[in-house]
């Protein structure tokens, strides 16, 4: 990947990107407080499951489709996969987060003069739809885009765990290090999934997100 494209990807996955993803826990706060996911080992196992069985079978295959569609300027496919992603969110909390962060990224990309971003301010947009628009515009290759997407998600989840648990910084880094091979394996596996097999349901994750919507005391947005 060209150095400038690499820098653009680093910008896109930075926690400093002003899209508000830090405000959401994706059910992890409830899982820690009420679901017994309260040790570094359990955090690792939870995140590994969501990455490999959830994001890897739902978001990543569509990421590749969206990159192709943006490259071909195929707006029918872009709209179709955007709607598919929103429909795949298993709880209201996950749907609201996806639309909120997607709109925030659309606004940012518009302000950065990325062509094609502005129309998404007026319609429901999945984060991944705008993420792939940015990657296509900045010549970020598909594998790097997929790894970057997973890494951004994972870092945010580790931040959630650090704020909710007494999770030491070194323990958090150990989790990240252990999950790096999972990210590469998940991206490779996602390239082999046939379109009719896109999608997955994780009942435990969905229940954690649903319960977080009504959690009495919480740090993260619902």
Swiss-Prot record:
Localization recorded for this chain is: Cytoplasm
Matching entries from Gene3D superfamilies are given as: Urease accessory protein UreF
Tell me yes or no: is Cytoplasm among this UniProt entry's keywords.
yes
Provide a GO CC annotation, any one. Answer: cytoplasm
Molecular function as annotated in GO:
nickel cation binding
> What domain of life?
Bacteria
Sorted keywords for this record are: Chaperone, Cytoplasm, Nickel insertion
Q: What does the sequence similarity comment in the record state about its family?
A: Belongs to the UreF family.
Q: What's the subunit arrangement here?
A: UreD, UreF and UreG form a complex that acts as a GTP-hydrolysis-dependent molecular chaperone, activating the urease apoprotein by helping to assemble the nickel containing metallocenter of UreC. The UreE protein probably delivers the nickel.
What is the stated purpose of this protein?
Required for maturation of urease via the functional incorporation of the urease nickel metallocenter.
Protein name in the entry: Urease accessory protein UreF
Source organism = Hahella chejuensis (strain KCTC 2396)
């Amino acid at each position: 990947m060209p150095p400038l494209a690499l820098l653009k990807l680093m910008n896109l996955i930075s926690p400093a990107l002003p899209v508000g993803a830090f405000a959401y826990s994706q059910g992890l706060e409830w899982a820690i407080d009420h679901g017994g996911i309260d040790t570094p080992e359990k955090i690792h196992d939870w995140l590994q499951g969501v990455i490999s069985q959830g994001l890897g079978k739902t978001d990543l295959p569509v990421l590749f489709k969206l990159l192709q569609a943006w490259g071909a300027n195929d707006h029918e496919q872009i709209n179709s996969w955007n709607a598919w992603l929103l429909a795949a969110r298993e709880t209201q909390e996950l749907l609201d987060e996806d639309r909120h962060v997607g709109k925030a990224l659309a606004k940012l990309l518009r302000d950065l003069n990325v062509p094609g971003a502005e129309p998404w301010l007026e319609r429901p947009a999945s984060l991944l739809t705008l993420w792939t628009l940015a990657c296509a515009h900045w010549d970020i290759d598909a594998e790097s885009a997929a790894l970057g997407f997973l890494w951004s998600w994972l870092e945010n989840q580790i931040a959630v765990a650090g704020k909710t648990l007494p999770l030491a910084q070194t323990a958090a880094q150990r989790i990240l290090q252990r999950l790096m091979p999972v990210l590469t394996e998940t991206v490779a596996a996602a390239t082999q999934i046939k379109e009719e097999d896109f999608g997955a349901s994780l009942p435990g994750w969905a229940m954690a997100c649903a319960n977080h919507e009504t959690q009495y005391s919480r740090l993260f947005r619902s």
